[in-house]
């Protein structure tokens, strides 16, 4: 199983990071709008074992092309950065994938939008993320912690602490702390 290694950093403003990426000659990949549907068993067995099951649709803002994936994430490994085994496959339909998981007795426990701008720098993927209620994050994913740290330093983000909690955990905590029962989190209509 492939290993996902990443550093997630909370930032106030994405503009300085975007500017730094441009100045460093990073490759712009695209702007995307994602919908992430998170599934678990009725008794929350995946969550209890620090595992995840997600169906994601990602729409390219420019071309409107859409990709849908189903992803299983294994438990996080201990270390300075977030790393975990990940298996992902492309599927034809978000609706069909969610229906299939429901037929297999998985329950959708959360759905949230994310705006993502994707870049490549130093052999790493750099994602500039905006999430409703949670704010702005930079995710740097690479083949090794060393490669990620190098990109983090080159973006002047070395002083930012790494957030090891997944977006799912951050969003669930936000909703629970506020007594929110609606688990479908979207950006306000514009």
Predicted feature residues:
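N-terminal strand-loop-strand beta-hairpin
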Residues: 1-125, 157-190
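Internal alpha/beta scaffold segment
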Residues: 149-155
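Extracellular structured ligand-interaction cores
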Residues: 137
């Amino acid at each position: 199983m492939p290993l996902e290694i990443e550093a997630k950093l909370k930032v106030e403003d994405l503009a300085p990071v975007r500017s730094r990426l441009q100045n460093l000659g990073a490759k712009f990949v695209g702007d995307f709008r994602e919908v992430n549907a998170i599934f678990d068993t009725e008794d929350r067995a995946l969550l209890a074992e620090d595992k995840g099951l997600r169906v994601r649709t990602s729409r390219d803002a420019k071309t409107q092309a859409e990709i849908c994936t189903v992803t299983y994430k294994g438990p996080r490994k201990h270390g300075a950065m977030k790393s975990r085994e990940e298996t992902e496959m492309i599927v034809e339909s978000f609706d069909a994938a969610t229906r299939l998981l429901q037929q297999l007795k998985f329950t959708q426990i959360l759905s949230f939008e994310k705006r993502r701008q994707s870049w490549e720098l130093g052999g790493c993927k750099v994602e500039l993320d905006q999430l409703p209620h949670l704010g702005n994050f930079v995710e740097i994913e690479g083949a090794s912690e060393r490669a990620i740290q190098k990109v983090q330093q080159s973006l002047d983000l070395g002083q930012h602490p790494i957030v090891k909690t997944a977006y799912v955990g951050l969003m669930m905590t936000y909703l629970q702390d506020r007594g929110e029962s609606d688990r479908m989190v979207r950006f306000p209509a514009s």
